[in-house]
From Swiss-Prot:
<dbReference type="InterPro" id="IPR000238">
    <property type="entry name" value="RbfA"/>
</dbReference>
<comment type="function">
    <text>One of several proteins that assist in the late maturation steps of the functional core of the 30S ribosomal subunit. Associates with free 30S ribosomal subunits (but not with 30S subunits that are part of 70S ribosomes or polysomes). Required for efficient processing of 16S rRNA. May interact with the 5'-terminal helix region of 16S rRNA.</text>
</comment>
<comment type="similarity">
    <text>Belongs to the RbfA family.</text>
</comment>
<dbReference type="Pfam" id="PF02033">
    <property type="entry name" value="RBFA"/>
</dbReference>
<dbReference type="InterPro" id="IPR020053">
    <property type="entry name" value="Ribosome-bd_factorA_CS"/>
</dbReference>
<keyword id="KW-0690">Ribosome biogenesis</keyword>
<dbReference type="GO" id="GO:0005829">
    <property type="term" value="C:cytosol"/>
</dbReference>
<dbReference type="GO" id="GO:0043024">
    <property type="term" value="F:ribosomal small subunit binding"/>
</dbReference>
<dbReference type="InterPro" id="IPR015946">
    <property type="entry name" value="KH_dom-like_a/b"/>
</dbReference>
<dbReference type="InterPro" id="IPR023799">
    <property type="entry name" value="RbfA_dom_sf"/>
</dbReference>
<keyword id="KW-0963">Cytoplasm</keyword>
<protein>
    <recommendedName>
        <fullName>Ribosome-binding factor A</fullName>
    </recommendedName>
</protein>
<dbReference type="GO" id="GO:0030490">
    <property type="term" value="P:maturation of SSU-rRNA"/>
</dbReference>
<comment type="subunit">
    <text>Monomer. Binds 30S ribosomal subunits, but not 50S ribosomal subunits or 70S ribosomes.</text>
</comment>
């Protein structure tokens, strides 16, 4: 697969995983997990997914473990949403970038404000 296609597939996988994790998973361990980066291998067989999660290292490790446990479900969901010949195996890891935590905080605050406006449109 050429580099541009690899980047497009990586971005599509990131968008879909973000949607599934944020809105369709019921596991409380992943409530504050955010997909920050996806790198799909050139043969499209493997995807390395970086996850940022607020909280201490123990909480982050629990979120990664929950996502690893749900990898089969997530992969099936990706298969139903994306037109790919091969849906990659998903490998989750913690994003260790210090700027990511502040970005996650910002995104969570924005999501709460948006949700509040949807529930109370007159405000």
């Amino acid at each position: 697969m050429d580099e541009r296609r690899t980047l497009r597939v990586s971005e599509a996988v990131r968008e879909e995983l973000s949607e599934i994790i944020s809105f369709e998973m019921d596991d409380p361990r992943v409530l504050e997990a955010e997909v920050t980066e996806v790198m799909v291998s050139p043969d499209s067989r493997h995807a390395s997914i970086k996850i940022a999660c607020r909280g201490d290292e123990k909480k982050q490790n629990h979120a990664i473990a929950a996502l690893e446990h749900a990898a089969g479900y997530l992969r099936r969901e990706l298969a139903s949403r994306l037109q790919l010949r091969h849906v990659p195996e998903l490998h989750f890891e913690r994003d260790k970038n210090p700027d990511v935590e502040s970005r996650v905080d910002f995104l969570l605050r924005r999501a709460r404000r948006t949700k509040g406006r949807e529930e109370n449109p007159s405000s």
